[in-house]
């Protein structure tokens, strides 16, 4: 498996990028109200955590205590991304730290790449995609990170990262949750997180 994803800026995508840029600039022009923004961001992160859990079916298949822990961990990981002690750049360490926070007290493999083969199954239990073997994970992730050039528009970088990360599927569990937070991290770095007030997971669940 090689990381060599290509994309094409169609008229529709170009228009969407322009719309995002207009909205970003409009929000940047708004006066900063730290107290109100902090409250709204807290509500937004909480909703993002709940929608992220719903995307994965958490709450339907887990005991109540485990379900609460899953949601609490997602919330903690999202808060970490926005904290002063959060990561400053995307690298292997950031990915492992995110996974460690998301699977904290839920899996002995929290923060560790999988050491066995894995596959993606459909609802009928049939394997529809076989993930790369464990020895290739670290190098494939490094390739993916290197491919995200700063010349690529931020929203597209976030999409490429999410797509590539899920294809590599570096962990036995939690890949979807980590992938969505990594997308949020890229958008934040590129200035497209809209001050942390948008709920990406709500859109993903609906579409």
Residue spans for each PLM region:
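FIC/Doc superfamily catalytic core
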Residues: 1-207
């Amino acid at each position: 498996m090689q990381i060599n994803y290509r994309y094409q800026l169609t008229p529709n995508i170009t228009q969407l990028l322009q719309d995002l840029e207009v909205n970003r600039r409009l929000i940047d022009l708004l006066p900063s109200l730290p107290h109100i923004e902090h409250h709204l961001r807290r509500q937004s992160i909480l909703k993002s955590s709940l929608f992220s859990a719903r995307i994965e079916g958490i709450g339907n298949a887990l005991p109540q205590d485990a379900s609460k822990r899953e949601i609490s961990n997602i919330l903690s990981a999202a808060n970490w991304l926005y904290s002063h002690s959060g990561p400053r750049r995307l690298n292997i360490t950031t990915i492992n730290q995110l996974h460690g926070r998301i699977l904290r007290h839920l899996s002995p493999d929290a923060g560790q790449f999988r050491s066995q083969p894995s596959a993606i199954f459909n609802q009928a239990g049939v394997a529809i995609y076989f993930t790369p073997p464990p020895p290739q994970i670290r190098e494939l992730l490094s390739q993916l990170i290197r491919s995200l050039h700063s010349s690529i528009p931020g929203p597209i970088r976030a999409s490429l990262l999410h797509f590539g990360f899920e294809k590599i599927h570096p962990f036995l569990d939690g890949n979807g949750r980590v992938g969505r937070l990594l997308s949020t991290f890229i958008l934040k770095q590129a200035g497209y997180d809209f001050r942390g007030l948008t709920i990406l997971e709500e859109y993903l669940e609906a579409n």
